């Protein structure tokens, strides 16, 4: 399929489709209600009939986006998926992010593929550690952030105290789009500031259906809600006075964050979030390549792999590479080029994947996510293009903090063991470190959080029939180093240098004191902190 014939009609068609896209992810601390919000958004867009809850309540459907066996067992979303739906003539792509603290590496990759983030805050807890870690990543990527204060139907913090915390800890100015009427735990509804009306909150069947919302004028609200209404108006007024009225440019520039109040479990406040995404979130725009040159959206097809997932369909043992379309039109069946290898890749099996739901996708536009099946040659960070070579920036690796040696339980299955470890490394499930001293039989697995090891063990046993033993190492921090650190630290207690497959040498240390001791004794050694903003070369 040639896309080099760019007629004015074709250019305007691509621009129109890119302009209709809103691609975002939800960032939050575990248990802030992220999967519930995902369900509520899908419900509002009429994608699913009734929302399922992650907590596995009887007679409620399972949450659609949680699909791996471990996720089902634990009620958390470990693997990311993408949900696409239409709302008000806008195509919304919601990229699901793992809901567990340990999976920040996978979450980070998802944040490389979105244009905006929704920061979901538990009203009772405020900004928690994982939320702040993810916020920092969004800040580095210059992603605009919409803030949703969730669970307002339960007792929690004071609304103004939450605004102060957001300002102090993120540096963003809160710009209310809606404001809660009634204190947390006594949720009466919201003042919709854009339309100057009161949306009254009504409890429904535990969120399984869309909440019925009734709207009232400010005068009617003042009469029915009394001091709850006047307090809400006063509070929102204080926030606007000390910050600013809604300003799209300040939001896009990462200086301010729109604020909405909700109860996602009861489907209240969700429509207002959808409206905010449509009206204010940035559409798919030209994406810069490695040299910083933005590739126009009307250029021939290009995209990059932000996630690789295997074992999504047990019957087929398949591999799905998730691609963010950056330019042009993706058409199923087109043969594209992989920038890293220069090899051709046929896109015959292209799907939209959300949870266990899959459907064949024939075309996709900038901002969309395509799942390419049988994509075992593709790796996280790979760029693909139809015409006009392009390479997008590499997706950085997080600094690992947990290290374990892996060995095959059955020596006769070493081949399967090696293949499994290689495959999981390609998928980005785990970082793999090696050295001549340890040998090929005992690679060191490095993870951001300990649950990644459970995923590796589970996948090795079930997907590769290569059960393995893990042995914990005492290291807790890593630094980027060079080859000459290997002999220098060979006999040092509390330190070790290993080679990662991308060619980086990592020096591992028991603790910060071991690191300081070595920095003092070997001032000539390169020991650089691993920053999420330093792409792995």
Positions of the model-derived regions?
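Structural and coupling elements of P-loop NTPases
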Residues: 1-537
């Amino acid at each position: 399929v040639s896309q080099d014939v760019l007629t004015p009609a074709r250019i305007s068609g691509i621009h129109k489709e890119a302009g209709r896209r809103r691609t975002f992810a939800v960032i939050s601390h575990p248990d802030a209600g992220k999967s519930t919000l995902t369900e509520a958004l899908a419900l509002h867009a009429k994608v699913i009939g009734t929302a399922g809850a992650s907590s596995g309540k009887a007679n409620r459907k399972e949450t659609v986006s949680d699909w791996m066996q471990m996720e089902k067992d634990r009620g958390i979303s470990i693997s990311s998926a993408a949900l696409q739906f239409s709302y008000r003539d806008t195509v919304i792509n919601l990229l699901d992010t793992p809901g567990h603290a340990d999976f920040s590496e996978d979450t980070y990759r998802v944040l490389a593929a979105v244009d905006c983030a929704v920061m979901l805050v538990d009203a009772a807890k405020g900004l928690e550690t994982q939320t702040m870690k993810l916020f920092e990543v969004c800040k580095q990527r210059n992603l605009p952030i919409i803030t949703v204060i969730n669970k307002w139907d339960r007792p929690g913090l004071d609304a103004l105290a939450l605004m102060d915390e957001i300002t102090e800890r993120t540096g963003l100015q809160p710009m209310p789009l809606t404001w809660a009427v009634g204190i947390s735990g006594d949720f009466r509804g919201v003042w919709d500031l854009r339309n100057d009306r009161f949306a009254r909150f009504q409890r429904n069947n535990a969120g399984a259906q869309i909440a019925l919302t009734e709207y009232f004028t400010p005068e009617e609200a003042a009469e029915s809600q009394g001091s709850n209404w006047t307090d809400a108006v006063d509070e929102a007024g204080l926030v606007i006075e000390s910050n600013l009225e809604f300003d799209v440019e300040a939001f896009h520039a990462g200086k301010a964050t729109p604020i909405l109040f909700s109860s996602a479990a009861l489907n209240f406040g969700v429509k207002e979030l959808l409206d905010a995404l449509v009206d204010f979130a940035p559409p798919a725009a030209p994406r810069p390549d490695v040299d910083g040159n933005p590739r126009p959206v009307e250029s021939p097809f290009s995209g990059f792999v932000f996630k690789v997932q295997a074992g999504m369909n047990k019957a087929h043992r398949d591999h799905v590479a998730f691609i963010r379309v950056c330019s042009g039109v993706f058409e199923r069946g087109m043969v594209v080029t992989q920038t890293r290898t220069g090899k051709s890749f046929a896109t015959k099996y292209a799907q939209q994947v959300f949870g266990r739901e899959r459907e064949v996708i024939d075309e996709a536009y900038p901002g969309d996510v395509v799942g390419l099946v049988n994509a075992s040659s593709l790796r996280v960070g790979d760029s693909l293009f139809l015409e006009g070579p392009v390479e997008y920036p590499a997706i950085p690796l997080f600094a690992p903090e947990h290290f374990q040696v892996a060995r095959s339980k059955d020596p006769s299955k070493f081949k399967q063991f090696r293949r499994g470890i290689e495959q999981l490394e390609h998928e980005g499930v785990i970082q793999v470190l090696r050295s001549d001293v340890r040998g090929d039989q005992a690679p060191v697995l490095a993870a951001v959080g300990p649950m990644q090891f459970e995923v590796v063990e589970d996948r090795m046993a079930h997907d590769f029939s290569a059960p393995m033993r893990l042995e914990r190492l005492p290291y807790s921090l890593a630094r980027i180093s060079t080859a000459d650190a290997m002999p220098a630290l060979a006999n040092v207690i509390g330190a070790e240098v290993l080679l990662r497959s991308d060619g980086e040498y990592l020096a591992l240390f028991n603790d910060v004191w071991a690191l300081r001791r070595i920095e003092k004794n070997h001032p000539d050694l390169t020991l650089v902190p691993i920053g999420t903003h330093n792409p792995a070369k």
